[in-house]
From Swiss-Prot:
This is Fe/S biogenesis protein NfuA. Its cofactor is [4Fe-4S] cluster. Involved in iron-sulfur cluster biogenesis. Binds a 4Fe-4S cluster, can transfer this cluster to apoproteins, and thereby intervenes in the maturation of Fe/S proteins. Could also act as a scaffold/chaperone for damaged Fe/S proteins. Homodimer. InterPro entries: Fe/S_biogenesis_protein_NfuA (IPR017726), FeS_biogenesis (IPR000361), FSCA_dom_sf (IPR034904), HesB-like_dom_sf (IPR035903), NIF_FeS_clus_asmbl_NifU_C (IPR001075).
Length: 194
């Protein structure tokens, strides 16, 4: 299995759950909702025969078949499904380190590339101040319209962050981008960092 690893403990736990469904041929389907976004969630669901999608990748395991959602496969790279016992019985865990990482290249639409750099380079730094920035739109032939949130909304340094940090980074990474514009209502200062 190249994209995802299912440990023996997880396999045995899932096989036991599946056997209790009294459905011959039942397997699991692994998919990510909203892959490549900050809202991505990795999911495992029962998959009765016929419920798999035509473009799913079928992975035959010892006791059952795991179906991997085609759109999710790149985001499942290096994912791990494990089962650990504890005092309460045990817990199935899914770790998918690439689930929230946008998959973009030079040919991706400009909004996807902007979101990629916001998620991977800009927001991790802003998070230390309890803030984040998101893309609202791309207008006027290459102007990124951004909105601050959290500790950045109302912050006295937002303008400096926008021009010296965010705009500079985005212009270096995305040559056809012409600039950025902030549409945040900075009069709301109750959560502001500065």
């Amino acid at each position: 299995m190249s994209a995802i690893t299912i440990t023996d403990a997880a396999h045995d736990y899932l096989a036991d759950l599946l056997s209790k469904q009294n459905t011959p041929g039942i397997g699991i389907r692994i998919f990510i909702t909203q892959p490549g976004t900050q809202y991505a969630e990795t999911c495992i669901a029962y998959c009765k025969p016929g419920e798999e999608k035509p473009d799913d990748t079928a992975v035959g395991l010892k006791s059952f078949t795991a179906y991997l959602d085609a759109v999710s496969v790149p985001f499942l790279e290096d994912a791990l499904v494990d089962y650990a016992t504890d005092r309460m019985g045990g817990q199935l865990t899914i770790k998918a380190p690439n689930a929230k990482v946008p998959m973009v290249n030079e040919d991706s639409p400009i909004n996807e590339r902007i979101n990629y750099y916001l998620q991977t380079e800009i927001n991790p730094g802003l998070a230390s101040h309890g803030g984040q920035v998101s893309l609202v739109d791309v207008v006027d032939d290459g102007i990124a319209v951004l909105q601050f949130g959290g500790g950045c909304q109302g912050c006295g340094q937002a303008d400096v962050t926008l021009k010296e940090g965010i705009e500079r980074t985005l212009l270096e990474r995305i040559p056809e981008l012409k600039g950025v514009r902030d549409v945040t209502d900075h009069s709301q200062k109750e959560n502001a960092y500065y």
